[in-house]
């Protein structure tokens, strides 16, 4: 989201005077006279009534008024500006409709970018900015990912408690439109807990698991099991369900669902979507140990008909998690490679053996090339002696 620098070609006193007159004219309970307590008191009074312009003003006009308020606000020293900034942010969340919410969003973004990057107030502005972005469907304009979020606060990192609060908000505003991003936010949230306080993160851990399971583009779920708050859920149904998605096959999920239908539905999970994901995960697991699979075997493992095998495999290939070739003539699927669902000690050993084999092959090639080069050199020398 772009933002223009704040600059008003009037003195602070003149701006304050004009704003007071403007809001009084709109019917706000404010004096048109400047406060004798200074510009900060003026700002408190102006911000207290600034939402009166939301009633009848045009968006462009309101944007200009808010821009004037921001231009004064950023001149206030940090140690005296917190209450003023927080009061303004609260007012910006009160926009009565989407067009005005966009104006308020632009104003908050302008304030955010004009505050010093080392100012702790930027966190509070950004938090309210996300709230307003949700109101006008502009969340993707202000939050593009966790890396971008962290870079914005690099010069003044918020506390763990503040980031937890922000991550919860970001999860809430993205869960209906971008499950993948929402899932990453929840994983970051759980990563902020330590062994000492992970036990209090039960609700966050459950939300994280549900979001990851519901995301149609998240297939590698093994890392969730290592998160401390998730470990505290061992023995709970949600942890059992996660474990199935991490390492079990389709029949295990079907059995779990038959025994705990109410629980699965109560978490907001869609059974058919779960079946679709578990079929893909089951196929990945089968591909790890089978270079080829018959259509008949796949119908049994995936609980689909033979006519559904080809469309299913094509969908799997689109994810790029598995590389394979369909052999329609022989009713088989030939596997080239697959991503592992879990990556533990066996996978590390397999990787080590593969790298060792590559090393030995490269050594053999190098030795062969050295021998060829040596033979060519000897031949050249012998021919030189003959002549």
Curated annotation (Swiss-Prot):
Signal peptide: none annotated. The keyword Zinc does not apply. Pfam families: eIF3m_C_helix (PF18005), PCI (PF01399). It is found in: Cytoplasm; Golgi apparatus. Its main location: cytoplasm. GO terms for molecular function: caspase binding; cysteine-type endopeptidase activator activity; translation initiation factor activity. Residues 181-340 form the PCI domain. GO terms for biological process: formation of cytoplasmic translation initiation complex; Golgi organization; protein secretion; sperm individualization. One of its GO terms (cellular component) is eukaryotic 48S preinitiation complex. Keywords: Cytoplasm, Golgi apparatus, Initiation factor, Protein biosynthesis. Component of the eukaryotic translation initiation factor 3 (eIF-3) complex, which is involved in protein synthesis of a specialized repertoire of mRNAs and, together with other initiation factors, stimulates binding of mRNA and methionyl-tRNAi to the 40S ribosome. The eIF-3 complex specifically targets and initiates translation of a subset of mRNAs involved in cell proliferation. Component of the eukaryotic translation initiation factor 3 (eIF-3) complex. The eIF-3 complex interacts with pix. Belongs to the eIF-3 subunit M family. This is Eukaryotic translation initiation factor 3 subunit M. It comes from Drosophila willistoni (Fruit fly). The lineage of its organism: Eukaryota, Metazoa, Ecdysozoa, Arthropoda, Hexapoda.
């Amino acid at each position: 989201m772009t933002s223009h620098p704040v600059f008003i070609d009037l003195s602070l006193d003149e701006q304050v005077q004009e704003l007071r007159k403007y809001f009084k004219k709109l019917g706000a309970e404010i004096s048109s006279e400047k406060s004798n307590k200074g510009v900060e008191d003026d700002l408190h009074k102006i911000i207290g009534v600034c939402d009166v312009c939301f009633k009848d003003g045009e968006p462009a006009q309101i944007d200009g008024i808010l821009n004037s308020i921001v231009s004064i606000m950023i001149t206030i020293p940090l140690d005296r500006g917190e209450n003023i900034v927080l009061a303004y942010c609260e007012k910006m969340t009160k926009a009565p409709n989407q067009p005005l919410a966009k104006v308020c969003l632009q104003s908050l973004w302008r304030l955010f970018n004009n505050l010093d990057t080392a100012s702790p107030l930027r966190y509070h502005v950004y938090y309210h900015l996300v709230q307003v972005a949700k109101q006008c469907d502009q969340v993707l304009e202000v939050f593009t990912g966790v890396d971008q979020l962290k870079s914005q606060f690099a010069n003044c990192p918020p506390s763990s408690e503040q980031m937890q609060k922000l991550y919860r908000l970001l999860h809430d505003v993205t869960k209906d439109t971008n499950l993948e991003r929402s899932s990453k936010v929840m994983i970051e949230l759980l990563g902020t807990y330590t062994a000492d306080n992970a036990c209090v993160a039960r609700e966050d851990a459950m939300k994280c698991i549900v979001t990851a399971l519901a995301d149609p583009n998240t297939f590698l779920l093994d890392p969730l099991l290592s998160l401390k708050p998730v470990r505290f859920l061992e023995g709970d149904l949600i942890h059992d369900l996660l474990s199935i998605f991490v390492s079990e096959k389709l029949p295990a999920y079907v059995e779990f669902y038959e025994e705990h239908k109410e629980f699965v539905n109560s978490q907001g999970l869609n059974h058919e979507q779960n079946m679709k994901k578990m079929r893909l995960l089951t196929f990945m697991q089968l591909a790890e140990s089978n270079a080829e699979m018959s259509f008949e075997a796949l119908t049994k493992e995936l609980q689909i008909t033979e006519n559904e095998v080809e469309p299913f495999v094509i969908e799997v290939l689109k994810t790029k998690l598995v590389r394979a070739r369909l052999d329609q003539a022989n009713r088989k699927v030939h596997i080239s490679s697959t991503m592992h669902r879990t990556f533990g000690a066996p996978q590390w050993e397999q990787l080590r053996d593969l790298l060792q084999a590559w090393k030995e092959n490269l050594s053999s090639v190098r030795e062969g090339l050295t021998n060829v080069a040596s033979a060519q050199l000897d031949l050249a020398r012998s021919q030189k002696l003959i002549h």
